[in-house]
Amino acid sequence: MFKNKVLLITGGTGSFGNAVLQRFLNSDFAEIRIFSRDEKKQEDMRIALKNDKVKFYIGDVRNYDSIDDALRGVDYVFHAAALKQVPSCEFYPMEAVLTNVQGAENVMRAAIANGVKRCVVLSTDKAVYPINAMGISKAMMEKVMVAKSRLCDPEKTVLSATRYGNVMASRGSVIPLFLDQLQSGKPLTITDPKMTRFLMSLDESVDLVLYAFEHAQPGDIFVQKAPASTVGDLAQAMKEMLESDSEVKVIGTRHGEKLYESLLSREEMARADDLGDYYRIPADSRDLNYDKYFVEGEVAIPTFDDYTSHNTQRLDVEGVKQTLMKLDIIREALNA
């Protein structure tokens, strides 16, 4: 489906963008466009890749004209540009709105205007029962995606989303922080050892995007089933792997953090399709004419639990070690 097509990745110099780019470099895409604000990161990527297939566009998703220009002639879009640091978004919530909501709306609106065939937007588990500005902004992005999917012609453009838990070793995540602390002989700083988080690799995140590109219907949200770990077990696993005797300091939760995360709400689980490795949350196809539902009669309401990092498969320390060994950053540290 990608032969001689053009792909654009917003936020393409970040962790997700890099992973997607590496997967698609040897594909049949005619051109891959990297759209981001940071000219230095683009220059570093250009020098590292030396690949004529990859084109670079400097711009900001907040600026509709810049993303509209970049999307001319594009067939597929992966929207990864975002503000994702929870504490920062707590202090600057309107910045999160401008990038994660308005910016995402700009991308989707420009995708529709330019006849992009498929546009997949990246969301997060923090969008489910959100308590922080980052999660709220991503929840709004999902709502915008679903609303726009109702209005655009699916024969021309299909909008969908992928929702992730914690992506291991991505920029700003805890594993690179722990690794730096252990290698420097510093104490490990843990917010709450009982806090649980989903564990997902960058490769798995790309697999999910590919699945969405190939299978999405308008308004779909795709979620990968993932194991989880406590932060305490993650820290212990890394200490043992690096044979470190660093002390552990519990510093308490940061602004906006939750004890556990949810990938699907109870309401979403009630209507989700179980696809084996993934869940598909279809868009609610009902309209605002609720009178007809009284005429049609009662509908049974199924009861489900939400899908959380507390009730999914829980990895112990040994299980976390096996999972961490899949990461390049860990293997490189052990071989150093």
Predicted regions and their residues:
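N-terminal Rossmann NAD(P)H-binding glycine-rich loop of SDR-like oxidoreductase domains
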Residues: 5-27
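Conserved Rossmann-fold NAD(P)-dependent oxidoreductase catalytic core, especially the SDR/UDP-sugar
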Residues: 79, 83-143, 147
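Rossmann-fold scaffold of SDR-type NAD(P)-dependent oxidoreductases
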Residues: 10, 71-80, 121
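Conserved residues in the N-terminal Rossmann fold of short-chain dehydrogenase/reductase
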Residues: 36, 58, 98, 192, ...
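Conserved glycine-rich Rossmann-like NAD(P)H-binding loop of the short-chain dehydrogenase/reductase
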Residues: 28-41
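Conserved Rossmann-fold cofactor-binding substructure of NAD(P)-dependent oxidoreductases
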Residues: 55-76
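Hydrophobic/aromatic anchor residues within beta-strands of the central parallel beta-sheet
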Residues: 56, 96, 119, 159-162
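Strand-loop microenvironment adjacent to phosphate/nucleotide-handling motifs in alpha/beta enzyme folds
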Residues: 113, 143, 147-336
